[in-house]
Amino acid sequence: MKNNLPIIDLFVSIQGEGKRAGHPSLFIRVSGCNLRCYFSGSICDTPYSSYNNEKSKFDIADVLSIIDDNPQVEDIVITGGEPLLYQAGVLELIHAIDDRLPNKHYITIETNGSIALEGEGCDLMTWVDLWSISPKLQNSIAPVGTKIEVLGKTVEFTEDVVNRLNEKRKNIDAISEIVVYGRDYQLKFVYSDENTITYIDELLGEIRTVLHDEYKYVPDFNSHVMLMPEGITEEQLQSKRQSAVNECIKKGWMYTDRLHITIWGDKRGY
């Protein structure tokens, strides 16, 4: 794992998704991701942290400065990109935050769940309050031959690229470890259409098998699985909301919206 921590966004807003939706939060976004997501013609909503990685703009001192300026904000969200590419760096950051805000912080790590904790990164289990896991399903990979323009660059999904992404996009063992040992977690899925439910059921079945066979653990997913409508505009979200809610009611899962898009649109830094 890489030890540096390329922070490219640093801002205070509200959490727009998941169990902590509505909480004032300090967002720390790192650059770099091991996946390249593509949903029904739209791509990752932060391509500057995945498709075309920006260089680091901030350091830990900048994070602490914003904390000093906003002592009322206790939720800290470490997002990306994929933060678990930088486990040692994330741990160093959390230690610094804890020194500045002892016992007054709530740490969320947003991850795609495809990278296992290793080495000193395993200590993150001690510090992270909420693991926000967004597993990438079959509907997150572009069809072979797709070409898209992203931030001035042409990205082509060749057969080799698609195969590699499909191999990397899920890590059942890594997710299962968080389910068992993490303080709290949420499995947050982007809802595209009815096929999404089939894919989720398949993934949950794989996780249940590992939990049963390796940990003798029977999970209650209903209080942890969340559906979120696909979209990066209010119009796109609205077109998926009712179907997503209906599926949540059928399955006993939770629904989460994307409040930041409803309020600010797909603007960076909100």
Q: In which residue ranges do the predicted regions lie?
A:
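Short, glycine/acidic-enriched capping/hinge loops at junctions between secondary-structure elements
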Residues: 18-21, 38-41, 268
